[in-house]
């Protein structure tokens, strides 16, 4: 076989559409929570592919599941069903409130399906009913949310920087203030078909919802016959120390969307709901070519079975505290964080006023010392590592973060 031609970081700028600005190194290999670049430099991974690699890189059981299914059948199309998709659906149903599942390929697709379902259910059940003033097709979302990059989901996201250049945008979407129940109550009416919310706003700064806020949304949706949609793309599949974050709050949604960690690095998305609401979608009303393919579902089934274990989920909560304790020590030395927030292994370090706007600079500096981390806006350094990252890796990774912080501090104070 012919050897592949050499590529460099410059190749990205030459050949790819510039929708991203990746780091100046190229990762070529990963094992557990360690990555290596083309030059052989190692990095501890606190990013996890943005909350995707929940079991790290190259987990032997996940790899085995991929190889086993690859030797059978990869793809069939939606004219046929397959064993892995049926088994994965049953796993999700047994583990959650759901009774029905729709599989797709990404979080954006899952949210698109959820919003379409909400409008279709409202059309079927409330159109032209006595006492109904106006069409029941309005969607309430929240500012600084992130629900994907399709035109529908990016409009729901409530971040103009992602949507303002693509007008005209889909209508009928209204944005309230996250964690402000009065704001939501003002927007949710009998014309509302759905409320979509993240239990923790990830891209919006790792901001957890208040328990009272989510319970209040549940009550408002019940009062106005609107579907409550929980976007758990980033918080799902063990990320917060429960299989799904709604389980912390004692409130169940009508629809839940999942992706990212569900495949452990293999693309897959899912929309979970009840029989009552799923009945709104009939044959041909929605679909996707690759959704529910046997290769993705075989991998996801293994990932889910490994993560949905009491010991592993308890370990996520323990690791959260390890992070918090080490970060407190870093902050005692450098005084850069105003707040550390999040749940489980979705953690946001909010920079104080002196270091406002420098999250990207800190992450880039830390990479020089061998740490891969994330940002959640200009003022928040974000971590979403493997759920089974070791105590040693946490300690070493945060030591590398501290070196990056010290480098930035010297610039700020000099």
UniProtKB/Swiss-Prot annotation:
PANTHER family: AMINOTRANSFERASE CLASS III (PTHR11986), SUCCINYLORNITHINE TRANSAMINASE (PTHR11986:SF113). It comes from the Bacteria. Its cofactor is pyridoxal 5'-phosphate. The keyword Transferase applies. Catalyzes the transamination of N(2)-succinylornithine and alpha-ketoglutarate into N(2)-succinylglutamate semialdehyde and glutamate. Can also act as an acetylornithine aminotransferase. GO terms for biological process: alpha-amino acid biosynthetic process; arginine catabolic process to glutamate; arginine catabolic process to succinate; ornithine catabolic process. This is Succinylornithine transaminase. Belongs to the class-III pyridoxal-phosphate-dependent aminotransferase family. AstC subfamily. The modification N6-(pyridoxal phosphate)lysine is found at residue 260. The gene is astC. SUPFAM superfamilies: PLP-dependent transferases. Keywords: Aminotransferase, Arginine metabolism, Pyridoxal phosphate, Transferase. NCBIfam families: arg_catab_astC, argD, PRK01278.1, PRK05093.1, PRK12381.1.
């Amino acid at each position: 076989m012919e050897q592949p031609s050499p590529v460099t970081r410059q190749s990205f700028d030459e050949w790819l559409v510039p929708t991203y600005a990746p780091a100046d190194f190229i990762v070529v290999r990963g094992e557990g929570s360690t990555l290596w670049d083309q030059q052989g430099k190692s990095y501890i991974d606190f990013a996890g592919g943005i909350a995707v690699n929940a079991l790290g890189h190259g987990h032997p059981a996940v790899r085995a599941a991929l190889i086993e299914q690859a030797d059978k059948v990869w793809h069939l199309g939606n004219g046929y069903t397959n064993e892995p998709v049926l088994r994965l659906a049953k796993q999700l149903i047994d583990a959650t409130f759901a009774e029905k599942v729709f599989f797709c390929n990404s979080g954006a697709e899952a949210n698109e399906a959820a919003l379409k379902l909400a409008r279709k259910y409202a059309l079927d059940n409330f159109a032209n009913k006595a006492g109904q003033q106006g069409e029941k097709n309005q969607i309430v979302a929240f500012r600084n949310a992130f629900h994907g990059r399709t035109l529908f989901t990016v409009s729901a996201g409530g971040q103009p920087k992602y949507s303002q250049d693509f007008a005209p945008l889909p209508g009928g979407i209204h944005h309230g203030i996250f964690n402000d129940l009065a704001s939501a109550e003002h927007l949710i009416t009998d014309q509302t078909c759905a409320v979509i919310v993240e239990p923790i706003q990830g891209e919006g700064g790792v901001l957890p919802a208040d328990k009272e806020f989510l319970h209040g949304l549940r009550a408002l949706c019940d009062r106005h016959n609107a579907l409550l949609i929980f976007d758990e793309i980033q918080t799902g599949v063990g990320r917060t120390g429960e299989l799904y974050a709604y389980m912390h709050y004692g409130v169940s949604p009508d629809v839940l969307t999942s992706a990212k960690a569900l495949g452990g690095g293999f693309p897959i998305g899912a929309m979970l709901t009840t029989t009552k609401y799923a009945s709104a979608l009939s044959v041909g009303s929605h679909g996707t070519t690759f959704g529910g393919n046997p290769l993705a579902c075989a991998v996801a089934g293994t990932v889910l079975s490994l993560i949905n274990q009491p010991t592993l989920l308890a370990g996520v909560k323990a690791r959260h505290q390890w992070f918090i304790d080490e970060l407190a020590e870093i902050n005692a030395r450098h005084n850069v964080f105003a707040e550390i927030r999040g749940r489980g292994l979705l953690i946001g370090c909010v920079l104080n006023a002196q270091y406002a706007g420098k999250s990207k600079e800190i992450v880039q500096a830390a990479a020089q010392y061998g740490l891969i981390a994330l940002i959640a806006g200009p003022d928040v350094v974000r971590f979403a590592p493997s759920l089974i990252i070791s105590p040693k890796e946490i300690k070493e990774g945060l030591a590398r973060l501290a070196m990056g912080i010290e480098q930035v501090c010297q610039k700020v104070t000099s």
